[in-house]
């Protein structure tokens, strides 16, 4: 019986194995058939695309034969024929084409499948001549697709109605209809040019201390040098002036000062421009007096970014050592004046935090980082590594910083709060007994210095030493024998210490993790010199009649800044991150929207909480008071606009109504001058109009609103502004837009780190603009000050606030004798002057308060001599959005405010392992 059962099992097993093999064979056959079908489908698609391209070429030929100034009806008919044939230069036709392709593929697949089912035994695709021809056509599919795309681009991006009543632009295939105002007699006669106004960077608020180290220094000019975004700032705290080096194309990450204290090297990270082209990391060496670029080093050499760098000291700064952020953390040594790389070697796969040349031994370079300290012997083009041996001493998780004692010993601070002294000793060679080997560094002494990490070391001119602690936030002064003499603790609200530098006299400078720069002494404590936000920044509002601006960010801080003396008036921490803000027309209160649907009203003078409300549970994207201040509109990500009655000069609020009709979240909105209507944009490119007195009703006939002269213009979609959109935009490239109060220009914040200045109105596609670089992440907001004298822009991830001065270019003939130039005898001379507003900003009639005399903006100061002439090419802007080139070094003098290529929208701001650390992390971290 058992034998019978065993034989039965064997037979069942054999049968199941045979069944599995049959199924595998069937599946293999099916896969082969499907691959054959795909090949045929590719060939069919190639044929369709080729026919489409031929059709496009024919349409283009017909268009060339038609006069450009023909009747509007003929132009519209031609445009519609292009759309019918799939060749319009808009995205909608291409979307239709893609649907057609899917239908073609589907029918072809069914046909092929039926054929393959009937004639399975006769399938020999790969051997037939027809198959080879089809494969060749399929291989050329990508080329044909490219050709079709190019042919499509030849056609105009907009469609004008036959009657000239409206224009349609397309965004991601969706039509956006904009009605032409009545005062436009002929749309073809509209001309959009570059505005005469330009921008000049005047002030930068903020400092990058959260994820950087050793990036604050005092120069002989009395200026503090530091960086934020792609700007290196030189700040004279006594005279309250700033100068800016603008040569970088993305986030500046590290800085080194030459032994002569004049020349400076700064390194940046990699990025990508708006066209997807890489922005290579590099080091720029520049003159801190003239702000001219002396050399650009490392293009094509560094990966990801420049992590740290240092000038040599023993040879008076002839050489520069750089460590990049690649996996191997490559160490390179450069003769920077010759722009030549002398030596290169891999250091370690672990984090490297610091590199330094030995001040007296020109052949020694020291690097340190996670669980290591390396001593490099440099000879010619070779680098030899000797690892620091901790021996009986506990090996730290991180060696954080380096300094050098007068006797040549190396001093290192570690994550355990210990200072290690490494002395050069002689040891006995293991190869031959009795032989002595010089140059081995060993720990000769250790000193417990701080609770938590020793984050930074600063060797002072008098031989004393300053150390900065991470966790304990203490600055300690040590004498020549490394005995502690004095100490002081940085208050908790400023964060932990990131950088320590020697100041004037007995002063010292501190950079902190909460983006403060402090100046202090052991006797008098600290004074704040620089401060900024510590997280992503979106909210911005300018005061209606004072030189004040308000910002709010993810760090929950609300800050009121003075744009004249560039100081912080007050700051308040909310319960939630702020995202948008607007001042009441009286200027007495400001409304702030948050990420949770709650919004706060604060007293603009005392920062006291006046009111708090909640609308929905999603992010509020825009707050906008009506012109008379009687209504407040709140745009939300729940697709609604909430309306509130406002009384008592902005101190009392009651729900008025709700605008319902958008199919996506609200992005921007504006009021009409009579407070009757609202224009709004949404995330799916809608332009809707609302009748507020009639119960917040949606106006169905949008042409009724075409002649409204909106009190403000912040909507990014509309007839007066649609020309600002770049070609091929997906609808998210523009974050904010604002029209100046004098209605002359439009400022724009984009996703490619740029601030643009357009002429207003801007009703032609691909309008030209002045383009400015300073931010290193998406620019989130822009706003003009009340007299249009300045523009404020905010950066997202870079957390910076930029204040730009509007400059009006005025041309003069040579006979005016303003400036004599031997190089341009017959050319006009161009001078800069601050832009003066044509009309004062008037308060609404409902406002009873009148600004005091001392609240008015002081007269503009004279233009400095160095600003009196415009260069042959404006180096801090690019007037065409089409050009983008890699930065090039200059052997001679290169102006510092050049625009290199477009900076990246850098999510890579925190792209190194230490960047992701929080300021309250464990002491074992390199940033604790």
UniProtKB/Swiss-Prot annotation:
Pfam families: Beta-prop_EML (PF23409), Beta-prop_EML_2 (PF23414), HELP (PF03451). Residues 107-131, 821-928 are annotated as: Disordered. The keyword Nucleotide-binding does not apply. Residues 14-63 form a coiled coil. WD repeats lie at residues 199-237, 241-288, 296-336, 343-378, 385-424, 442-480, 485-521, 524-563, 567-604, 610-646, 653-692, 702-760, 767-806. Keywords: Cell cycle, Cell division, Coiled coil, Cytoplasm, Cytoskeleton, Microtubule, Mitosis, Repeat, WD repeat. GO terms for biological process: attachment of spindle microtubules to kinetochore; cell division; mitotic metaphase chromosome alignment. Residues 867-876 have a biased composition (Acidic residues). InterPro entries: Beta-prop_EML-like_2nd, Beta-prop_EML_1st, HELP, Quinoprotein_ADH-like_sf, WD40/YVTN_repeat-like_dom_sf, WD40_rpt, WD_repeat_EMAP. Belongs to the WD repeat EMAP family. Homotrimer; self-association is mediated by the N-terminal coiled coil. This is Echinoderm microtubule-associated protein-like 4. It comes from Xenopus tropicalis (Western clawed frog). The gene is eml4.
């Amino acid at each position: 019986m058992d034998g019978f059962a065993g034989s039965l099992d064997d037979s069942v097993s054999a049968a199941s194995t045979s069944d599995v093999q049959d199924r595998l064979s069937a599946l293999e056959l099916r896969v082969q058939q499907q691959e054959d079908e795909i090949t045929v489908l590719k060939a069919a698609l190639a044929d369709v695309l080729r026919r489409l391209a031929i059709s496009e070429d024919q349409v283009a030929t017909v268009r060339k034969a038609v006069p450009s100034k023909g009747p509007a009806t003929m132009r519209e008919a031609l445009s519609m024929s292009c759309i019918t044939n799939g060749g319009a230069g808009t995205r909608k036709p291409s979307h239709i084409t893609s649907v057609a392709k899917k239908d073609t593929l589907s029918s072809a697949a069914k046909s092929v499948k039926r054929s393959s089912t009937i004639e399975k035994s006769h399938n020999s695709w790969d051997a037939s001549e027809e198959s080879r021809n089809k494969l060749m056509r399929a291989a050329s599919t990508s080329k044909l697709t490219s050709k079709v795309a190019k042919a499509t681009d030849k056609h105009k991006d907009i469609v004008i109605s036959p009657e000239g009543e409206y224009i349609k632009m397309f965004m991601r295939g969706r039509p956006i209809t904009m009605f032409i105002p009545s005062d436009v007699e002929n749309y073809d006669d509209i001309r959009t040019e570059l505005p005469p106004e330009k921008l000049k960077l005047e002030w930068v608020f903020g400092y990058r201390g959260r994820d950087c180290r050793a990036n604050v220094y005092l120069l002989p000019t009395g200026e503090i040098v530091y960086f934020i975004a792609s700007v290196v700032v030189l700040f004279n705290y006594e005279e309250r002036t700033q100068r800016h080096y603008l040569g970088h194309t993305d986030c500046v990450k590290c800085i080194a000062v030459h032994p002569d204290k004049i020349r400076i090297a700064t390194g940046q990270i990699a990025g990508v421009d708006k066209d997807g082209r890489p922005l290579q990391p590099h080091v720029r060496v520049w003159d801190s007096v003239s702000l001219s670029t002396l050399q650009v080093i490392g293009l094509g050499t560094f990966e990801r970014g420049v992590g740290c760098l240092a000038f040599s000291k023993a040879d008076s700064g002839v050489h520069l050592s750089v460590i990049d952020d690649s996996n191997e953390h490559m160490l390179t040594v450069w003769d920077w004046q010759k722009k030549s790389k002398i030596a290169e070697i891999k250091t370690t796969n672990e984090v490297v935090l610091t590199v330094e040349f030995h001040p007296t031994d020109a052949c020694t370079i020291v690097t340190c980082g996670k669980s290591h300290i390396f001593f490099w012997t440099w000879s010619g083009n070779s680098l030899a590594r000797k690892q620091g041996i901790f021996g009986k001493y506990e090996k730290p998780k991180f060696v954080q910083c380096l300094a050098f004692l007068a006797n040549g010993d190396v001093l290192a601070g570690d994550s355990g709060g210990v200072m290690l002294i490494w002395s050069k000793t002689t040891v006995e060679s293991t190869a031959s007994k009795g032989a002595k080997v010089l140059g081995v560094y060993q720990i000769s002494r250790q000193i417990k210095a701080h609770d938590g990490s020793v984050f930074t070391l600063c060797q002072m001119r008098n031989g004393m030493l300053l150390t900065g602690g991470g966790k304990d936030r203490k600055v300690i002064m040590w004498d020549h024998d490394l005995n502690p003499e004095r100490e002081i603790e940085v208050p908790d609200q400023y964060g932990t210490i990131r950088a320590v530098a020697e100041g004037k006299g007995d002063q010292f400078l501190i950079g902190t993790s909460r983006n403060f720069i402090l100046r202090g002494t052991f006797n008098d404590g600290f004074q704040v010199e620089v401060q900024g936000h510590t997280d992503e920044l979106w909210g911005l509002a300018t005061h209606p009649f004072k030189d004040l601006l308000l910002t709010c960010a993810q760090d929950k801080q609300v800050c009121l800044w003075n744009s004249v003396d560039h100081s912080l008036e007050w700051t308040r921490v909310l319960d939630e991150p702020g995202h948008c803000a607007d001042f009441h027309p009286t200027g007495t209160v400001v409304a702030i929207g948050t990420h949770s649907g709650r919004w706060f009203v604060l007293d603009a003078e005392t920062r006291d909480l006046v009111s708090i409300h909640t609308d929905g549970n999603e992010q509020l994207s825009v707050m906008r008071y009506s012109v008379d201040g009687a209504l407040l509109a709140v745009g939300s990500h729940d697709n609604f606009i909430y309306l509130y009655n406002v009384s008592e000069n902005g101190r009392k609020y009651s729900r008025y109504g709700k605008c319902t009709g958008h199919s996506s979240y609200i992005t921007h909105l504006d009021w009409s001058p009579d407070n009757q209507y609202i224009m709004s944009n949404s995330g799916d490119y809608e332009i809707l109009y609302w009748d507020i007195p009639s119960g917040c009703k949606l106006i169905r006939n949008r042409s009724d609103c075409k002649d409204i002269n909106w009190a403000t213009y912040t909507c990014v979609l509309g007839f007066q502004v649609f020309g600002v959109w770049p070609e091929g935009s997906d609808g998210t490239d523009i974050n904010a837009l604002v029209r100046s109060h004098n209605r002359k220009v439009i400022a724009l914040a984009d996703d490619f780190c740029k601030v643009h200045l357009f002429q207003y109105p801007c009703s032609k596609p691909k309008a030209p603009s002045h383009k400015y670089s300073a931010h290193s992440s998406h620019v989130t907001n822009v706003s003009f000050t009340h007299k249009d004298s300045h523009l404020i822009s905010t950066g997202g991830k870079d957390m910076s606030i930029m204040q730009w001065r509007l400059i009006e270019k005025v041309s003069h003939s040579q006979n005016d004798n303003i400036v004599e130039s031997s190089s341009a005898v017959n050319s006009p001379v161009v001078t800069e002057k601050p832009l003066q507003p044509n009309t004062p900003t008037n308060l609404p009639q409902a406002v009873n308060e009148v600004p005091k005399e001392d609240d008015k903006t002081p007269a503009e100061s004279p233009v400095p001599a160095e600003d009196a002439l415009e260069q042959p090419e404006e180096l801090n802007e690019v007037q065409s959005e089409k050009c983008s080139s890699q930065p090039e070094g200059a052997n001679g003098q290169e102006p510092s405010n050049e625009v290199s290529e477009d900076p990246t929208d850098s999510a890579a701001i925190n792209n190194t392992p230490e960047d992701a650390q929080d300021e309250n992390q464990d002491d074992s971290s390199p940033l604790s």
